[in-house]
Amino acid sequence: MTKHGKRIRGIQETYDLAKSYSLGEAIDILKQCPTVRFDQTVDVSVKLGIDPRKSDQQIRGSVSLPHGTGKVLRILVFAAGDKAAEAIEAGADFVGSDDLVEKIKGGWVDFDVAVATPDMMREVGKLGKVLGPRNLMPTPKAGTVTTDVVKTVAELRKGKIEFKADRAGVCNVGVAKLSFDSAQIKENVEALCAALVKAKPATAKGQYLVNFTISSTMGPGVTVDTRELIAL
């Protein structure tokens, strides 16, 4: 048996695929899985009881994770004049206006999150076909269209993340690194869950958190009992 096969078998022996676990138990399972040579990301996948085809049931927002994601973000800010100077001072990795718009039109997307001042959105909006599919388009709902670029860049550095339901009503979000201690991972997941529950549309009927899975990059997907999460 190959090393890969042994690792997969070892993972499968750590938990019951058909069972739903408490959040703490699910994190323990991820921690007990055979290790790899890099620090894996802990991902959450949540199926929501919404109809994304309806405009009033499209979920998108942001949340500040108490312990950050463990990832060093490359932050881009669309701004001009004094706001551009503020963004540079705040530590944004890329700052510009029309020059950045043209660069992105040419296919460059080597950044993780984009922020824009309101006056830049007329030009930034033209990048929808490039930024939209990559979830990089600044939006007021996510807090990335703002006049306070200093505060926004600082929040992103500290662990503010965006979440968005796709066309199937599923949110996929990286919430931590596996090297975080279990309590830190749990608190980050709980913060995300609280934000998702708060974002529940008034028109959404029936069960809201339909399915909740937590996984690591090279590890299993462990189903979490949603009854615990709804109570947060």
UniProtKB/Swiss-Prot annotation:
InterPro entries membership: Ribosom_uL1_bac-type, Ribosomal_uL1, Ribosomal_uL1-like, Ribosomal_uL1/biogenesis, Ribosomal_uL1_3-a/b-sand, Ribosomal_uL1_CS
GO MF terms held by the record: rRNA binding; structural constituent of ribosome; tRNA binding
Gene Ontology CC, one term: large ribosomal subunit
UniProt entry keywords in alphabetical sequence: Repressor, Ribonucleoprotein, Ribosomal protein, RNA-binding, rRNA-binding, Translation regulation, tRNA-binding
UniProt-listed GO biological process terms: regulation of translation; translation
Assembly with partners or alone: Part of the 50S ribosomal subunit.
Function description: Binds directly to 23S rRNA. The L1 stalk is quite mobile in the ribosome, and is involved in E site tRNA release. Protein L1 is also a translational repressor protein, it controls the translation of the L11 operon by binding to its mRNA.
Record family assignment: Belongs to the universal ribosomal protein uL1 family.
UniProt-recorded name of the protein: Large ribosomal subunit protein uL1
Source species: Chlamydia trachomatis serovar D (strain ATCC VR-885 / DSM 19411 / UW-3/Cx)
